[in-house]
Amino acid sequence: MKLNGVFTALATPFRDDLSLDERALASFVDWQISSGISGIVPCGTTGESATLNFEEYCTVVRLCIETARGRILVIAGAGSHCTTETISRALFVQSAGADAALIVVPYYNRPSDEGVYQHFRAVHDATNIPIVLYNVPQRTAIDISNDTIRRIAELPRVVGIKDCTGAERVAALKAILPEKVAILSGEDETALASYMNGGSGCISVVSNVAPKMAVELYRLHALGKINMAKQVSGNLAALSRVLFIEPSPSPTKYALSLMGKMRPKVRLPLVELTSSGQTAVKNVLETLDLLRQQKAMHSQL
């Protein structure tokens, strides 16, 4: 498996009573597919996986796989700070038919680099599914070394890394990782720089709201149209900044509510966007013409 392109870190729709909105989720996945993305990543940070019980987690993963129907890749979040729990989740996504499992570096425990390696090796050896390593020190309080990333990447079924430490690291990782391992940016603001340094794609939050724009950035870079890509990257960066103006995914869900994709509901301890945050998000969506485009699309249906 070679991972290339834009993969949406999928938001999870909730109803007003905060139960899963399965109909909205299926519709959202279909819209993502029609917008040209390469894959979806359900049950990650943006999907509020920390607030889903195991039954809900299984429902979201199954529904994404069933809706995708092989048209795009499904890389299901399966990480935890507990190795046995991570193995259980990885075995589930394997049995459900996911294309790969996204495994985050264990958080809260703050293990050593050797502990992180042994965690990934245990998950790898207990399963038979391709694995994408997720390095996000902003949330785990651990930034594992390049050498440890290399050791993990040498495990046979590790096929990618989602790295959120900046585009500067991509070239260094590219030089030491096996060819089979894709380097995926975890930051929309630096996605273009990551591509230019040898990155294979992006696991994107912004593509929840502007999937066509995120795909266009990837396409323009692939075609060598760097000046045009820089213009698109500037727009995506502005959108990315406002989608993190308050704790994510509250701004993303509010943006999607304006676009008619899902309610703005989030589960505690997250709260819905403040009025000032709502104004900021709406202003950026209007500046980028995303609301008008969405209304025009609905009028054609």
Curated annotation (Swiss-Prot):
Catalytic activity: L-aspartate 4-semialdehyde + pyruvate = (2S,4S)-4-hydroxy-2,3,4,5-tetrahydrodipicolinate + H2O + H(+)
PROSITE patterns per record: DHDPS_1, DHDPS_2
Keyword Lyase in annotation: yes
Keyword Cytoplasm on entry: yes
EC number(s) reported in the record: 4.3.3.7
Any single Gene Ontology cellular-component annotation: cytosol
Keywords: Amino-acid biosynthesis, Cytoplasm, Diaminopimelate biosynthesis, Lyase, Lysine biosynthesis, Schiff base
Record-marked site positions (Part of a proton relay during catalysis): T45, Y108
CDD domains cross-referenced by the UniProt entry: DHDPS
Pfam families in alphabetical order: DHDPS
Catalytic site positions: Y134, K162
GO molecular function: 4-hydroxy-tetrahydrodipicolinate synthase activity
BP GO annotations: diaminopimelate biosynthetic process; lysine biosynthetic process via diaminopimelate
Binding site for pyruvate: T46, I203
Top-level EC class as recorded in UniProt: lyase
Subcellular location: Cytoplasm
SUPFAM superfamilies linked to this entry: Aldolase
Pathway participation: Amino-acid biosynthesis; L-lysine biosynthesis via DAP pathway; (S)-tetrahydrodipicolinate from L-aspartate: step 3/4
Subunit-structure text: Homotetramer; dimer of dimers.
Function: Catalyzes the condensation of (S)-aspartate-beta-semialdehyde [(S)-ASA] and pyruvate to 4-hydroxy-tetrahydrodipicolinate (HTPA).
Family: Belongs to the DapA family.
Full protein name: 4-hydroxy-tetrahydrodipicolinate synthase
Organism: Anaplasma marginale (strain St. Maries)
